[in-house]
């Protein structure tokens, strides 16, 4: 299995799209962000995966994908406080992150489902971390840095 570093070295899972294929994937990504009535968590997961797969930038595609997840979850009311830190999860389970991204890039229904499940786990872990931090702040035990 591959680690998170391998995903970053290759800048994404699967074959890197070029030219018209890249333009089409990016257009689809923009449309997906604005689709109404789509399940918010599924939309956020697919947007993240598409940033990894399309990789429009020379670096930072994974970070942009994780940022978009946080933005979409807040915008769509899934986690309106913005305190969930789901973007920490990939660093905690880098192999699972790389494997889930690879599964998505396979293009199979099973791969897409595996990715969405992974993203849901990341959101849950982020909510749990936010709760832990909020409790520490309330108890006066949280220290910066």
PLM regions with names:
Residues 1-145:
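FIC/Doc superfamily catalytic core
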